[in-house]
């Protein structure tokens, strides 16, 4: 469980803080890690659970600012699906979950490299992965059930906290895929989770170092 307790005066700020803390925690762990999915739950509601482990309760109580908008990111394990897109297509959340977030890595290449890529998807993945102009990005995207979104994008070549690009819709495909997990099951039509040309297999991404131009 990752707690992100920096204080929040609104739902939007609570989401921004949660995404920022997930991204920084991921940065501390380093690169070349598997995608992770989080449930975003109001910290105050977590503390009301009798079954909350004592060590987690102590940690949350010592850092919570008592804001109803402060969220705790709870990592999800044993998820369905073999890749991120398939996993998100099968996810649904109980009402107690206010939002969701994903942390994933992708290969980034310049637009001209994307234009010259092979048409075969698998060949394109290999082409991007081995191209000398490639870079890698770590994308953290979070959404709230009510529709708000926030994204953080860090490139491996500019691996500093002050170089992380942030915005509401930097990776629209991933935002849409996360929002779809809150739709009624019969109404779901989950978009490709990669967004901006980032397929779940690690395809090219049109993200510049200052943000994601998708």
Where are these regions (language model features)?
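Short, intrinsically disordered low-complexity segments
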Residues: 61-119, 126, 135-138
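Solvent-exposed interaction surfaces and binding hotspots enriched for charged
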Residues: 2-10, 56-75, 181-182, 186-188
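Short linear interaction motifs
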Residues: 11-23
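Glycine-rich, aromatic-bearing surface loops/beta-hairpins
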Residues: 111-214
């Amino acid at each position: 469980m990752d707690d992100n307790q920096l204080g929040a005066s609104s739902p939007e700020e609570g989401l921004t803080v949660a995404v920022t803390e997930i991204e920084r925690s991921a940065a501390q762990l380093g690169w070349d890690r598997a995608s992770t999915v989080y449930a975003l739950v109001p910290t105050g509601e977590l503390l009301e659970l009798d079954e909350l482990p004592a060590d987690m309760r102590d940690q949350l109580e010592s850092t919570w600012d008592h804001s109803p908008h402060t969220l705790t990111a709870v990592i999800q394990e044993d998820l369905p699906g073999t890749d991120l897109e398939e996993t998100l297509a099968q996810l649904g959340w109980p009402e107690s979950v206010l939002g969701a977030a994903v942390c994933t890595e992708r290969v980034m290449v310049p637009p001209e490299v994307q234009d010259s890529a092979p048409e075969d998807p698998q060949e394109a993945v290999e082409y991007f992965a081995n191209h000398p102009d490639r870079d890698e990005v770590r994308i953290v995207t979070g959404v709230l059930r009510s529709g708000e979104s926030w994204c953080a994008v860090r490139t491996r070549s500019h691996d500093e906290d002050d170089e992380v690009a942030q915005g509401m819709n930097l990776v629209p495909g991933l935002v849409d895929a996360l929002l779809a997990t809150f739709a009624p099951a019969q109404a779901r039509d989950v978009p490709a989770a990669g967004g901006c040309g980032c397929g779940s297999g690690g395809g090219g991404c049109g993200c510049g170092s200052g943000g994601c131009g998708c």
